[in-house]
Amino acid sequence: SNSYIGGLSDGFYIIIDCVDDEEYMGFFCISTKTLVEPQWFSVTIADEGIGINELVLVEDMDAGFGYVDRFGHVVIECQYDWATPFVEGVAQVGKWIDDDYYEYYIDTTGNEINLMMNSFTQHQLLYL
């Protein structure tokens, strides 16, 4: 396996580990001096930076998107089909439920913080 370190972003280094032609990502957090072993398909740090209570967006190839803290502890299980990084305590997520796709906002505990923004059927998405 080959490992390498990506660029510095808001006090985080992205760590990438290549095993059998698969890439797994983790991170090193400078402020907590914590190395979180590569285990996800992707790791995303918000462009605006991460506040002290903000979370890191991670993607599991099978389970989808979720969020971990600066120590790598899972805070919101990987469960979303689409998600954005948290900015000022809010993230936007999307999820398929049966044949309907829902997008909504969540707080850093995973609770929905307003009504679902959009709801489309699979058929309607073909025409967007």
Q: What positions do the PLM features span?
A:
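Residue-level detector of conserved, function-critical positions
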Residues: S1-L128
